């Protein structure tokens, strides 16, 4: 696999296999030798970001992929949720989830997030509430001026996003441009809650290797500051065995909460 070319954004519709992605990365959030506590870190940071109740309103989850884990905690504090995703096959998975037809289960992720909340909600009740709050599943492309074409979204109160921009950008300049484009969708005073990778160049789904543009912590923070976001919290973790590069060569991961000036 080492000699295979890296696939990029335009390859997703033809080559990204959501079923394999879900079974590889979203079967269980428990720490693994390869990813460490990446998934539990993500769930914990999203829960902590929304726990204060200060981040609320209308939410867009940008680059949702075939998963709903980014909005588990957000769903309790946001009145409506739009799921925006580039790949048609991933949007199809999200529609299957919303209708209750998806065979893959996110129950272990929901259970972990609900235990963090400590309110005693059941997995079934939370998932039902999430489905009801999803007001749409729409296409998006961060490379376009209107990133939600053919839809038009004026502004929202909250944007969440996980592992998205690094899979699109091919340079720091591109990442900065895309960060500014995404930030422009937020109303003044709106919040961004972001989870992503630090360093690296790829991740794998089945037999395919997809580009993941690696940036340092300081480069990432500078890009969002340049986009007009005031960083409120920044937290990061590291992969336990960075020498293992079968599925990914990223160095670590981060969570950012920021507010638009």
Which residue stretches match the model-derived regions?
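Class I SAM-dependent methyltransferase Rossmann-like catalytic core
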Residues: 2-56, 69
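Conserved class I S-adenosyl-L-methionine
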Residues: 54-67, 80-85
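S-adenosyl-L-methionine
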Residues: 98-149
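Short alpha-helix
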Residues: 119-126, 211-228
């Amino acid at each position: 696999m080492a000699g295979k070319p890296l696939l990029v954004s335009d390859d997703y519709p033809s080559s990204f296999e959501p079923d394999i992605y879900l079974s590889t990365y979203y079967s269980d959030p428990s720490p693994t030798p390869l990813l460490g506590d990446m998934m539990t870190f993500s769930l914990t940071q999203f829960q902590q970001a929304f726990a204060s109740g200060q981040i609320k309103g209308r939410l867009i989850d940008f680059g949702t992929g075939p998963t709903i884990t980014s909005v588990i905690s957000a769903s309790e504090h946001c009145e409506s949720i739009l799921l925006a995703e580039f790949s048609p096959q991933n949007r199809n998975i999200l529609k299957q989830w919303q209708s209750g037809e998806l065979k893959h289960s996110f129950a272990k992720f929901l259970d972990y997030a609900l235990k963090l909340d400590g309110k005693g909600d059941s997995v079934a009740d939370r998932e039902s509430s999430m489905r009801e709050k999803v007001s749409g599943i729409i296409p998006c492309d961060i490379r376009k001026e209107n990133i939600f074409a053919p839809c038009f979204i004026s502004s929202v109160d909250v944007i969440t996003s996980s592992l998205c921009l690094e899979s699109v950008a091919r340079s720091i300049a591109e990442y900065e441009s895309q960060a500014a484009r995404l930030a422009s969708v937020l109303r003044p005073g709106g919040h961004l809650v972001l989870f992503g990778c630090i360093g690296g160049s790829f991740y794998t789904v089945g037999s395919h290797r997809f580009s993941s543009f690696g940036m340092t912590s300081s480069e990432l923070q500078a890009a969002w500051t340049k986009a007009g976001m005031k960083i409120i919290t920044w937290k990061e973790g590291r992969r336990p065995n960075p020498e293992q590069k079968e599925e990914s060569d990223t160095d670590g991961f981060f969570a950012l909460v920021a507010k638009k000036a």
